[in-house]
């Protein structure tokens, strides 16, 4: 998958530590074209001290890790985004003013993919109060939820899944969201997703429902919060939405900590 923040973060971090970096884009390598993941892993593992993978399939990064013989870092798959969780946990710790196990956060929107899955597991591991607000058809898989609940039982974490966005955000310290249509999905998905999620937009009104004057807004970016991109303008012209998952008012407000998070 294409990347701005994740790639830059890995490259800057590596170079800050004196490490060399090679970027292999999909069109410039033989992965899954002329060479299997298993063979690629064994070759790269002999040349490099670590591998970061960013792509669609969780199975790919797990196969790389199985055969590379060196650490493999998951920079994002459809299922999980663990390195983003390091940033999110640090950001919430910096802005909450209290221990993470006394902190509550909500994720509202399409909860089937990497960000909601990862936030659910993160919150469970850290003993946090986690709420997911989404239509039931867009909830995380039962397997992910069961795993998170099992972990939360050990850490004292709380997990709530609800179709009511207002119920999800009441009393929270942070409200997270993500794009409603993910990389690789067709344009046709927008209409269905907007119809399903129109009541889950992060607006000033939803922020106020939290009842917490210090509530913060988080988004892993990129975000559709105005018309200043080609896609944002297309969404406005097609659906009449200026900002999709979050409004410009929230994104540019003092409650927004998205750039600290990024």
UniProtKB/Swiss-Prot annotation:
Effect of residue 137 to S: In strain: Vedros M1801
Record localization: Cytoplasm
Binding site for L-ornithine: 114, 178, 182-183
Organism: Neisseria mucosa
Protein name in UniProt: Ornithine carbamoyltransferase
Catalytic activity of the protein: carbamoyl phosphate + L-ornithine = L-citrulline + phosphate + H(+)
Protein's job: Reversibly catalyzes the transfer of the carbamoyl group from carbamoyl phosphate (CP) to the N(epsilon) atom of ornithine (ORN) to produce L-citrulline.
Similarity annotation: Belongs to the aspartate/ornithine carbamoyltransferase superfamily. OTCase family.
Annotated metabolic or biological route of this protein: Amino-acid biosynthesis; L-arginine biosynthesis; L-arginine from L-ornithine and carbamoyl phosphate: step 1/3
Annotated effect of mutating residue 153 to K: In strain: Vedros M1801
Keywords recorded for this protein, A-Z: Amino-acid biosynthesis, Arginine biosynthesis, Cytoplasm, Transferase
Species classification: Bacteria, Pseudomonadati, Pseudomonadota, Betaproteobacteria, Neisseriales
Outcome after substituting residue 123 to A: In strain: Vedros M1801
Enzyme type, top EC level: transferase
Gene: argF
Name of one Pfam family that matches: OTCace_N
Keyword hit for Amino-acid biosynthesis: yes
EC numbers for this chain: 2.1.3.3
Impact reported for residue 48 to F: In strain: Vedros M1801
Superkingdom assignment: Bacteria
């Amino acid at each position: 998958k294409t990347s701005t923040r994740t790639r830059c973060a890995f490259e800057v971090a590596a170079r800050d530590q004196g490490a060399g970096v090679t970027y292999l884009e999909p069109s410039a390598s033989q992965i899954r074209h002329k060479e299997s993941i298993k063979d690629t892993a064994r070759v790269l593992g002999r040349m490099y001290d670590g591998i970061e993978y960013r792509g669609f399939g969780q199975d790919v990064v797990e196969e790389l890790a199985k055969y590379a013989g060196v650490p493999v870092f998951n920079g994002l798959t459809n299922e999980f985004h663990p390195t983003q969780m390091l940033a999110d946990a640090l950001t919430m710790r910096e802005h909450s003013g209290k221990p993470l196990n006394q902190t509550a956060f909500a994720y509202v929107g399409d909860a089937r993919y990497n960000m909601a899955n990862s936030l659910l597991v993160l919150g469970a591991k850290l003993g946090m109060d986690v709420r997911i607000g989404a239509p039931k058809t867009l909830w995380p898989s039962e397997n992910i939820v069961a795993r998170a609940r099992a972990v939360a039982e050990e850490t004292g974490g709380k997990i709530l899944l609800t179709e009511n966005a207002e119920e999800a955000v009441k009393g929270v310290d942070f409200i997270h969201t993500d794009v409603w249509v993910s990389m690789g999905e067709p344009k046709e998905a927008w209409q269905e997703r907007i119809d399903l999620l129109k009541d889950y937009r992060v607006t000033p009104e939803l922020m106020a429902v939290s009842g917490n004057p210090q509530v913060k807004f988080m988004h892993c970016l990129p975000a559709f919060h105005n018309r200043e991109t080609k896609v944002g303008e297309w969404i406005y012209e097609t659906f009449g939405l200026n900002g999709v998952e979050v409004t410009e008012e929230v994104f540019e407000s003092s409650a927004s900590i998205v750039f600290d998070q990024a």
